[in-house]
Swiss-Prot record:
Annotated ranges, domain EngA-type G: 4-169, 177-352
Native source species: Acaryochloris marina (strain MBIC 11017)
Encoding gene, per UniProt annotation: der
Gene Ontology terms, MF aspect: ATP hydrolysis activity; GTP binding; ribosome binding
Protein's recorded name: GTPase Der
InterPro entries the record matches: AAA+_ATPase (IPR003593), G_ENGA (IPR031166), GTP-bd (IPR006073), GTPase_Der (IPR016484), KH_dom-like (IPR032859), KH_dom-like_a/b (IPR015946), P-loop_NTPase (IPR027417), Small_GTP-bd (IPR005225)
Keyword presence, Repeat: yes
Pfam family, one: MMR_HSR1
Amino acid sequence: MGLPIVAIVGRPNVGKSTLVNRLTGMMDAIVHDSPGVTRDRTYRPALWNGRDFSLVDTGGLVFDDQTEFLPFIRQQVMIALAEATVVVMVVDGQAGPTPADHEIAHWLRQQDTPVLLAVNKCESPEQGITQAAQFWELSLDEPLPVSGIHGNGTGDLLDQVVEYFSETPESEDEPEIKVALVGRPNVGKSSLLNAFVGENRSIVSPISGTTRDTIDMVVRRGEQTYRFIDTAGIRRKKNVSYGPEFFGINRAFKAIRRSQVVLFVIDALDGVTEQDQKLAGRIIDDGRACVLVVNKWDAVTKDTYTINEFSKQIRSRLNFMEWAEMIFVSAQTGQRVEKILNLVDTAARQFEQRVTTSVINEVLEEAVSWHTPPTTRQGRQGKIYYGTQVSSQPPTIALFVNNPDHFKDNYRRYIERQFRENLDFTGTPIRLLWRGKKLRDVERNTANRATRA
């Protein structure tokens, strides 16, 4: 069994995301002064009185409207309710009870899950008692005055929440691979996530920009656990207004940094765009392992040579990511989706790989014997004394040389290729740090190591 789940529900714009941010101590949920900002159900880790649990922020619940995303949001709320240990209904203490609140309360009373009532926006403790008293008419549990902004009353709310948990908390820390799903809007990231999870976890819609929160979902396959981060689509900044989508894009960049492996989703119909190239550069700058996922492959008219032609086109546009493995899939039909996790496993393993100094220097000696370092116009030849891995995630190797300026880009790329071919750094960037060092310092360090041995 997993952690207890607490579902946060309520009509639009009552401050659910603000309250979730307060209860979890995080600033992940997008908060913006317009209704309907949260669309998917979003999971946040929380801790109170030594009990770990998950808070689920859901979209604003409206029953009598079929426009845009509202039917999808209702479906998400119902799924959250089905898996929750306890539900917290959030209402607006400043607005007072509304017909929508009554409708939601009536629906919740018909469910089997226990319900707590949080009266939000009670910024003054004195006025909060009066504001909360109005909500007895909803015929739920005692109305609890809280303030998502200032934190008033949140401790009392959490005290009641944890009372619904079982007496045997699970505190096992499972190793997991953190995977970020990134790409331009409407390339099929949420459809891929749903294919992995096996349910409509994220709102899937042909309207560009549907997902605006980063959404975490844990998936288990065999003994391996994966934490998928479904991010907002990334588009050119000049095409993004200052609002929820702006914040979602910035959080997508944070999701890349938070991940170990990035599933970079590309639309097979559009190919690699200029924005895709910039996003690829972002992944490399952040030093993350990567798998290129070419989605919507079912929509492409194919013959015997199609996949090779597409591969060449994509590789030529992303020639600086030649180390990333590529797979052609269809989230719609499920074609090859399961194989993505095999590539994730490989990329994550190589991302964390550590190689002994002796093996690194064997590769260097072989590389130099086949292709000696260049000589400058002044007759000075570059010399590589030795190399050693200084960190992983991504693998980073320091090369100690007589003068880094003697080694131009073409020779540096050659050395990187030798490491990749001999040490199998598939799916991960590697960083080479070229460090100047005088020969006598190298000899002294070598002698010191020999003496200690």
